[in-house]
Amino acid sequence: MSNKDSIIHVIETRKSVRSFTDETPSADILCRCGAESSPYLKVVDAAAIGNGRVGTYGVISGRPAYVAVVCKDDEQVQAGIDGERMVLALTELGIGTCWLGGTFSRQRVTEAVAVPDGARCVAVIAAGYARQHRGLVERVMRTSVRADHRMCVSDFIIAGVAPRELDSALEAVRLAPSACNRQPWRFAFNLSGSIDVYGTPSDSFMKLDVGIALAHFLAVQPHYRMTENTHYIPKLTAITTLIPD
């Protein structure tokens, strides 16, 4: 397979995992996948939080490792990109992951990692080895968020016509995880070849979710760079403009 085909396969393979075995991936594996190369990702020391758990209220079973996503509000898009790049690298190694935005103890995590002034822990990523069969809680969670039901690519294109050569990248965006499966990203295609990216005002995780989706797009189409989106559309939040090199 070509590198692009490999990346697409990893994106198609990735599923949110909530039922893990008791085998915990090492911090070295997490770091090799990008957990410490980003200023927004911090491996949670299991010893510092006691019993290796971050208070996930029964949503997560088993003993995965945890990576805290720590950033300021205006850094959430890049934090989402960096976090999902790590997720894809872990997926390629056969390690399951799950983004957690609300179902964990922020206090417990904040006490275990360094949080810069003005920043906060916006999410954690659980990473571990998936159990062969999903537990009851996981099955209920997947049903409640309609995890296997996603919008069509055409549903998040709000203007212009997407070039056919971007079909794979846009399908990768469609497969990106998001809080409650809301998929808050919207794309507008310009005649110049640039793409204006917006977010719907859904919840406090919107910018993080758009960053996660952008990680998928840029993984498949790395020859785009991000710049400021100066185009206003009512009821949408301008996130970035993607410009082809």
What are these regions (language model features)?
Residues 1-245:
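Acidic, surface-exposed loops and disordered segments
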